[in-house]
């Protein structure tokens, strides 16, 4: 009898812990400062983020909520991907960690810009095409560059530089970036209703 009560209490603690984590994710989406006045659609993840997952997830909102292809998707921590397919009440998101996903980024506080690409399912990216004359250091913060033609607005947080490699002959540096957003077990995400000008 005591063992059954102990097991029941352990189950309740686990359930409460999961609920607390989901609440924390939801609270992070309230008033995300880096999207400014751009409207967002709050969504719930309906498939694709259980543990070590692939490179896509499905959200419970679609075109009826104003969502269109190529719109950025964020959590309270930063950019996680972009919308690649849209139905009336669902959309599919390609995650930033995907090996096929590319995003223009800038290193905050410097003039350094580059292109980051996912490593295929990890919470890390590889940044390339950085002018080696620009000083980039480990610990530097990266965000979307928002340069002309970019599918992303400027200043969406991406992650932190964890390694820098310089090829002096090519005048180019590459960096490793660890994403701010944890892509494991996502429950909520916001679609930023933003489209590039033109």
Give, region by region, the residue ranges found by the protein language model.
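A secondary-structure micro-motif
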Residues: 14-18, 24-198
């Amino acid at each position: 009898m005591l063992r059954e009560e102990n097991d029941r209490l352990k189950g309740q603690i686990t359930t409460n812990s999961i609920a607390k984590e989901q609440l924390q994710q939801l609270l992070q989406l309230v008033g995300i400062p880096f999207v400014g006045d751009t409207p967002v659609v709050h969504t719930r993840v309906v498939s694709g983020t259980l543990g070590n997952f692939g490179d896509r997830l499905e959200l419970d909102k679609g075109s009826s909520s104003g969502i269109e292809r190529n719109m950025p998707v964020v959590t309270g921590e930063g950019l996680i991907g972009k919308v690649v397919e849209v139905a009336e009440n669902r959309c599919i998101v390609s995650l930033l960690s995907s090996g096929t996903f590319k995003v223009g980024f800038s290193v905050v506080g410097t003039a350094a810009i580059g292109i980051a690409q996912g490593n295929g399912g990890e919470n890390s990216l590889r940044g390339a095409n950085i002018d080696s004359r620009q000083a980039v250091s480990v610990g530097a913060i990266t965000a979307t560059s928002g340069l002309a033609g970019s599918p992303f607005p400027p200043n969406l947080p991406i992650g932190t530089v964890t390694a820098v490699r310089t090829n002096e002959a090519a005048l180019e540096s590459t960096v490793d970036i660890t994403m701010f957003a944890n892509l494991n077990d996502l429950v909520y995400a916001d679609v930023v209703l933003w489209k590039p000008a033109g």
